[in-house]
From Swiss-Prot:
Positions of disulphide bridges: none
An example Gene Ontology molecular-function term: oxidoreductase activity, acting on NAD(P)H, quinone or similar compound as acceptor
Organism this protein belongs to: Tolumonas auensis (strain DSM 9187 / NBRC 110442 / TA 4)
InterPro entries: NqrD, NqrDE/RnfAE
Membrane topology: Multi-pass membrane protein
Spans through the membrane: 14-34, 42-62, 72-92, 103-123, 131-151, 178-198
Protein name: Na(+)-translocating NADH-quinone reductase subunit D
One term under GO cellular component: plasma membrane
Similarity comment: family membership: Belongs to the NqrDE/RnfAE family.
Subunit and interaction comment: Composed of six subunits; NqrA, NqrB, NqrC, NqrD, NqrE and NqrF.
Lineage: superkingdom: Bacteria
Length: 215
């Protein structure tokens, strides 16, 4: 039962209580760049989840034989190999989306979430829990991407996953889209708003002030 509860906590905590974007403020760059459309946000979320999960798994499996002096190089090699596989699969099965995501899939290699979980968790934990930790953090990251992507695409273009929800005035409808939501800075403000709301509702996530207490 203890193992089951621990596995459940490892998998689910990155959604709200320890979200990599909302609490740790990691992976912001890609969150700004790929969330103007749900298709790109979903694919990026899936790619990061797969890479984080399996990199954690493989690193945990060999953690006892990795020399401490080269552990970062080994971690980056494993992560880079997985990213190459994901990128090639994306090009093979969805070339148009691959072009839209451009360099951002390749930049998963340097994503702080992937490297951070490999170093902080996978190097110290058994394979199964490491895999769940990677999947959980990938899903937590993806949850925010999809939330931001939904708001930006619906308000910015009146569609969701490319499906028209509100007919725009340009097409004879009534909806006037807010093009500002399709610009990258809008994602920055949305994520900032989400962080503010979450930390207001969950004061324990607020950082201590310089005087050593939380307001």
């Amino acid at each position: 039962m203890t193992d089951h509860n621990e596995a459940k906590k490892v998998l689910l905590s990155p959604f709200i209580s320890n979200n990599p974007i909302m609490l740790q403020v990691l992976g912001i760059c890609s969150a700004l760049a790929v969330t103007s459309k749900m298709e790109t946000a979903f694919v990026m979320a899936l790619a990061v989840t797969v890479v984080t999960g399996f990199s954690n798994l493989f690193i945990s499996l060999i953690r006892h034989i990795i020399p401490n002096s080269v552990r970062i190089i080994v971690q980056m090699t494993i992560i880079a190999s997985l990213v190459i596989v994901v990128d090639q699969l994306l090009k093979a099965f969805s070339y148009e989306l691959s072009k839209q995501l451009s360099v951002f899939v390749g930049l998963i290699i340097t994503n702080c979430i992937v490297m951070g979980r490999a170093e902080a968790y996978a190097m110290k934990s058994p394979p199964w829990l490491s895999f769940l930790d990677g999947i959980g953090n990938g899903l937590g990251y993806g949850f925010i991407l999809l939330l931001v992507g939904t708001i930006r695409e619906v308000i910015g273009s009146g569609s969701w996953f490319g499906i028209t929800l509100f007919e725009t005035v340009n097409n004879g409808g009534w909806y006037i889209p807010n093009g500002m939501l399709l610009m990258p800075p809008s994602a920055f403000f949305l994520i900032g708003l989400f962080i503010w709301v979450l930390r207001t509702l969950r004061p324990e996530q607020q950082e201590p002030t310089e005087h050593g207490h939380k307001e």
